[in-house]
């Protein structure tokens, strides 16, 4: 399979990819990074599946456009600017997964294969093709032929990588750009490193039946770690170590599944460094974002206390055994000598039930602090699927978020997007400028 390691293909598609993989699943993933004609900084998604790559890339692209540039109008972007911001974004993600190892890889076409998806002999013709509004017009390659046509290129410095990413802009734009970037991420991270982080190495990163990306794939792109869970830190279950997230990511993650109580996202993903969150529904990924940096202010002592407390409450019961109270207090640098801990046990568990509730614990050691979050601010939602947008034109939906309305009479709606956001802000209300609320599917 050329230089494209079979291990890589098995990791992405499963070991039985040559026999059991549906052609439709592979075809749904064969698209490039294409900007919307209606929203110059928004990427389009043609079919279900590749949102596992497109949504994280869109989130990092917005981070760069909103906070790393001096654009007076972040929604305006000319052709050359699109090239720069996309390539810089792809390089940013590759830098994250490399962890400053100064070793980077790109999956690219074999130099001797002058296919229609790659550089054309006629530059004018190539330029014209790359500006097409869809990346689906390139030649159809089957699963085997595609993987026989790519190679691995290595780079020993970030500057070399960035230059190569810019030079291959047409590759990212053309039909197999998303897959080539996904392979570049895995090769840069290292196949063995990915295997060591995935909970079940036998489970492929892309579901061979439905084509959805796994949580490990999403986490890899968002944090640089291919762990399978979204909670903070590691947990132990029946002697097995289950890896989670270990630091605040640049871009966050929220999921509708938490509102349905199927999982609980930890504060490292809920409270990223920038106010941008990939939003997960049962089948799709979208992006929610704002320019309000007060939403991601440094972690308050009470937030840190909640996070530490919850690491000792792996089943999310809202309480811990009183036997681990001393460990929690030590982790938070609170006074933890034996007599004081016993006094706190008596105060926090007056009925002698042997448990410490989260609420009384926070009130005792971290009384209510004034919030720095503004009462209202402008928010945006992105959904890359054409059919999920008005008139099938991919564009951001603008709205206003209002915080702090605990009176149920003031609730505006119970849409999926609000239910998802309430896992982070329980009393948020949303007023959208469009006639209908954003779709998460």
Swiss-Prot record:
It is found in: Nucleus. Keywords: Apoptosis, Hydrolase, Nucleus, Protease, Thiol protease, Ubl conjugation pathway. Its EC number is 3.4.19.12. SUPFAM superfamilies: EF-hand. GO terms for molecular function: cysteine-type deubiquitinase activity; K48-linked deubiquitinase activity. Pfam families: MINDY-3_4_CD (PF13898). The active site is at 51 (nucleophile), 284 (proton acceptor). One of its GO terms (biological process) is proteolysis. It catalyses: Thiol-dependent hydrolysis of ester, thioester, amide, peptide and isopeptide bonds formed by the C-terminal Gly of ubiquitin (a 76-residue protein attached to proteins as an intracellular targeting signal). GO terms for cellular component: nucleus. SMART domains: DUF4205. Disulfide bonds: none annotated. Belongs to the MINDY deubiquitinase family. FAM188 subfamily. Hydrolase that can remove 'Lys-48'-linked conjugated ubiquitin from proteins. This is Ubiquitin carboxyl-terminal hydrolase MINDY-3. It comes from Xenopus tropicalis. The lineage of its organism: Eukaryota, Metazoa, Chordata, Craniata, Vertebrata. The gene is mindy3.
